[in-house]
């Protein structure tokens, strides 16, 4: 609907591996090609290989549109330091994005 907000609920499975400790990642959520929230320094563990699920919630109040246009949400992850490897959905684990429209 016009002027609706969208609650974005993300459960992201991720693993981070490196040859050192103190792994960290950056994550952003995008609406179509526009980043709507971004962080560059999520500490993910103190071992050389770490994995698990991260949860992020975001109320997108600047969706725009007239209610008839499709909107795509997605996540992007990156390593903080060179030499780290970031993998999503490791070992067939599942990630999800749940969207809830909140009327104007």
Segments (PLM) and residue ranges:
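Terminal beta-strand-rich extracellular "head" domains
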Residues: 1-104
């Amino acid at each position: 609907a016009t002027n609706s907000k969208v609650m974005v609920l993300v459960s992201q499975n991720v693993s981070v591996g490196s040859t050192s400790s103190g792994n960290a990642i950056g994550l952003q959520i995008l609406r179509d090609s526009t980043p709507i929230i971004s962080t560059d320094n999520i500490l993910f563990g103190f071992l050389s290989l770490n994995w698990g699920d991260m949860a992020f919630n975001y109320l997108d109040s600047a969706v725009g549109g007239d209610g008839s246009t499709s909107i795509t949400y997605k996540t992007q992850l990156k390593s903080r330091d060179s030499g780290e490897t970031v993998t999503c959905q490791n070992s067939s684990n599942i990630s999800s994005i749940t969207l809830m429209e909140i009327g104007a």
